Design a protein with these regions (language model features):
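Compositionally biased terminal segments of proteins
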Residues: 1-237
Length: 237
């Protein structure tokens, strides 16, 4: 493993403690984002936060109140950094010298496919995560998004036109903009990362990313996949 600046083993220990407790609440949130993908599907990188989504749920404020009332009985919560709005909440729990960020989002109504039942509750799928990542790269420069897109493409088979159609159900995006973000991604952003499991071959990564950009723009089948693993049939580890 790469020499890590953060102690991900300790962070994962805190994550595991939270997820074990979380499973008893029975709330309809599903774990998504980099932690869902990295810890429970691909094991391709480390992820320090927990992101939980529901989809346009009118009871979101009620869920957050339930979480707030229960979490302080089991964890040390940093309320000074907490944030609560109508459709978004952020909570930090601390243990020793580490802080775990947990975010709750009342997302748009559409999602790609169904969630997966897992030991801690509901887990997102690579297809929905990928369609979210396409939207994310338009609005932010986050190397983890590109890293995740590449690893999803290498590990699962799918058609890019189908995935883009899923992404457009959630936001107004243009395929030219997505292709440009993929093609012009600055590889220098991957030079000093501390969350990769294995070292990154930048030349290989760039070749794969350029092929992904071409496949995406043409609406082709994903040609960089090295496995016979349809993304719609993806199973957690």
């Amino acid at each position: 493993m790469n020499s890590l600046k953060k102690d991900y083993r300790k962070l994962y220990h805190i994550q595991d403690k939270f997820l074990s407790w979380w499973g008893n609440l029975g709330l309809p949130f599903y774990l998504t984002g980099g932690t869902a993908l990295g810890r429970f599907y691909l094991n391709h990188r480390c992820s320090e936060d927990l992101d939980f989504f529901v989809n346009r749920d009118p009871f979101f404020p009620r869920y957050i109140e339930e979480i707030k009332n229960a979490i302080e009985r089991h964890f040390r919560v940093n309320l000074q950094q907490a944030l609560f709005t109508d459709d978004f909440s952020r909570i930090f729990i601390t243990e020793d010298d580490l802080s775990l960020k947990i975010e709750f989002v009342n997302d748009v109504s559409y999602r790609s496919g169904n969630t997966v039942s897992y030991y801690f509750g509901l887990l997102d799928t690579p297809l929905n995560i990928l369609s979210n990542k396409l939207n994310a790269i338009i609005s932010r420069d986050e190397p983890k998004d590109i890293f995740d897109i590449v690893y999803i493409a290498v590990n699962y088979s799918f058609n890019w036109q189908v995935v883009f159609a899923e992404a457009k159900q959630k936001a107004v995006i243009n395929e030219i903009d997505v292709e440009e973000r993929l093609w012009n991604f600055p590889l220098s952003l991957l030079e000093n990362i501390d969350w990769n499991i294995e070292s990154v071959d930048l030349d290989y990564f760039n070749r794969v990313l350029r092929k992904i950009a071409d496949d995406f723009l043409l609406g082709n089948d994903n040609s960089v996949c090295i496995k016979d693993s349809p993304i719609t049939e993806a199973k957690p580890l």
